[in-house]
Amino acid sequence: QQLSAKLSLDGAEALSVDGVYRGGDTENPLGLTVSIPGLPLAPANAFLPPDAVRLSGALQGKLTLAGTSAKPKIDGALHFAGTQVQVPMIGTTFGLGTEKIVIDSSRVRFTGYRIIAPNKKPLTIDGEVDFADITTDLRIAATDFQFINVAKNRGSMVYGQGYMDMEATVKGEIDDLMIRGSVDLLRGTEVNYVMQDAPPELKNRAQNMVTFVSFSDTVSQRQDR
């Protein structure tokens, strides 16, 4: 059976599917090609919770699907174009790199893929996610990455500047991930959290509730004792 479908948004083709479905072939009924000249991401915001991420930009690429619907074999490559991810919880917007994300036999491979901070420093991702058995093997690294960049305003729960160095690995099945690594907060980090609905007794004890201390600061350590 021959298949053909197209999706257009605002008069422009965003996605098309062409190929065949072989109903009598139980081993390999799918033979489809998915072309994505430019799938806008902003419409997806309508289906996301208000406090989740907000997307802009587009997804582009080309995929082939073979095998069965229960166990498809996906190959191809995708990349983001002009894409930004706004995180309302921390009021900060990150850019997504334009590097190709290769999909090989249903394995999504990241090679130096970048998430770009407001200060233009990248967090890089290497490794793969295997959708056949939903397992991950990722390495994440960042240097001087600005993870918060928010001016103080009446609506902000979090404001300030935050910078970090990070090295981490993410491995295992998606429902049993093992995450290991280190995160170093850098000089210049000053982040404030506003407790908007805290009970009065908690507000009265809020000062110095959390204190970050440098272990190389021997004066502070002696005072703590």
Feature annotation, model-predicted:
Residues Q1-K62, A70-D75, H79-E167, E173-R225:
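Interface amphipathic segments
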